[in-house]
Amino acid sequence: MVYRFIVLFILLWCSCSNAIPATTGNGRIMGGSEESIYNAPWQVSIQVSARHVCGGAIYSKDIIITAAHCVQDTSVTLMQVRVGANYHNSGGRLIPVGAYMIHEQYNKQFKYFDIALIRLATQLTYSLSVKAIGLATVSPTAGASVSVSGWGYLQPNGADGFASSLQVVQLNVIERNECASAKYGYGWDFVGDEMICAAAPNKDACTGDSGGPMVSEKLLAGIIAWGYGCGQLNYPGVYVDVAVLRPWIIKTANSI
């Protein structure tokens, strides 16, 4: 999943064809610092064929929230979720996946409604390093400080690959209407009503972070979705606004 890296091509193409999908491949953390899983026990690594591809957040003992583009067209037989680990490739516990559900309105091209729920094949046992996170009921306000975590690239070019240990970065929320305005580079067509943005100088999520949590006041406020490059000026990271899709999450978690 290299969405963040294909965004440049897509943006250039879209300038001529009026169609964007700026997506962030696997999201990543740039400009952050190491984080202990004990401080983010809801953080998980989504694995395909025994390799990290995306992040996710624990909603309940058998439900994980992630981005739709992280699981689309993937067989559950190839998927596992690593929980309770500081490292995406070791520690904690690997749980097989029983099923997943992508939002019915998910749009592969524009990445609208980029959210999915994963049902684990076996239930989690909660501990100091494995816990669920509650859902935000209201969207974070503009300028609010939020934390974003994951094992994604530390550099835009991916020279160092995925981070070996969990990373976290503090960003500031940019309200959806402002993010879609002429102040930034995306435009109204590409920042949907169910999206929210966040940024800070030289800080961002990057490839490998997609599907991971944006946390505000200890609640899940967003899901890392897409962006143009990593840490690019005038191109904030774009996230699914959890408060907007909260009803869908609750309903789907009870039926998947």
Regions found by a protein language model. Name each.
Residues 2-8, 59-69, 80, 162, ...:
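C-terminal subregion of chymotrypsin/trypsin-like serine protease catalytic domains
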Residues 41-61, 110-111:
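A conserved glycine-rich beta-strand in the N-terminal activation segment of trypsin-fold
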Residues 87, 115, 121, 127-200, ...:
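Chymotrypsin/trypsin-fold serine protease catalytic domain
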Residues 30-31, 80-126, 131, 138, ...:
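Conserved catalytic-core segment of clan PA serine endopeptidases
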Residues 10-27:
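N-terminal signal peptide
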Residues 25-49:
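N-terminal activation segment of mature serine protease catalytic domains
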Residues 22-27, 46-47, 64-67, 72-108, ...:
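Conserved H-D interstitial segment of serine endopeptidase catalytic domains
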